[in-house]
Amino acid sequence: MGAKMIDLGEASKVELVLESSYTSRDVALYALGVGAGSDPLDDSDRRFVYERGEFHALPTFAVIPQSNAMLSTITPTGFNLPGMSASLECLLHGEQYTELRAPLPTSAKLKHLVRFKNAYDKAPNAVVEYGITSVDESGRQIMYNEISFFVIGGGGWGGDRGPSAPAVSPPDRAPDAVIEEKTAPNQALLYRLSGDWNPLHADPAFARRFGFDRPILHGLCTFGYLGRHVMKAMFGNDPRKFKSIKVRFAEPVFPGETLVSRMWREGDTRVIAETIVKERGKAAIKNGVIESRD
């Protein structure tokens, strides 16, 4: 089955160029989708949701342009890139790395160079990794993303199992900062307006097909909450200090649940973080590493 989903020979040749654009409206809508502005009187959030004054894109918005470009490759049969063809129900977002290589503009036209990085045989499943470099119209690199997909049923071709990813364990001490924030019951419906239209996050009947009693929150929405919390608690709420974020998605979140971001400072520029679902005591995000600029 895996051979039908992943053709390493073809995948290794991938150097796909995709395009996308966004405006200040998209930037503000994304910020609302990851909880900014839930208190309209909170001055610290206004710069991310109100286009006048000192308007900024949230750093984790850097995942959206390339994500939407990748989603444009979806066909009626599912996700379809050279060397990989899998239906959406076979794909799980395993890990995400996002790095800002220039100040994030509040509107832009971008080109995204998509390169295949690795595929590992975790029979009967597989892990596939892509790297995406995004440049503006002048050719300047704006952001870089690495996406790791867990492909259900995609393994079994006898390939390399790959390295065991080192766990990033929180220090054995109390967190340096904790932010607790309840998501809205319609949080997934709001976040999906940024481009991820997967019915798993909107259609109760569709969600039940995958064992959930109701739609779940997008993993990248939880990712956005964590990035916003770290920026606020550890970087003085200054998006210019935010360099990169890497996480592993561990547990689904249901809209309306409470996210608890726990943060530990390590050195001058590194933060270890995790996201706990308060109501169930489950870690939704593990192995969080966020880097700031010097």
Language-model-detected regions and their locations in the chain:
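Hydrophobic, proline/glycine-rich low-complexity stretches
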Residues: 2-109
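HotDog/MaoC-like acyl-thioester-processing domains
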Residues: 2-16, 68, 91-179, 253-256, ...
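A contiguous, surface-exposed recognition patch within enzymatic or periplasmic domains that forms
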Residues: 3-51, 166-222, 229-232
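Phosphate-binding glycine-rich loops and adjacent basic patches that engage nucleotide phosphates
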Residues: 23, 71-78, 149-154, 183-194
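Generic structural signal for residues positioned in beta-strands
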Residues: 29, 47, 59-62, 97, ...
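Amphipathic, positively biased hydrophobic alpha-helical segments used for protein targeting
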Residues: 42-46, 73, 118, 150, ...
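Generic structural "secondary-structure junction" signal
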Residues: 50, 63, 93-94, 100, ...
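Catalytic-pocket segment enriched in acidic/His residues
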Residues: 205-289
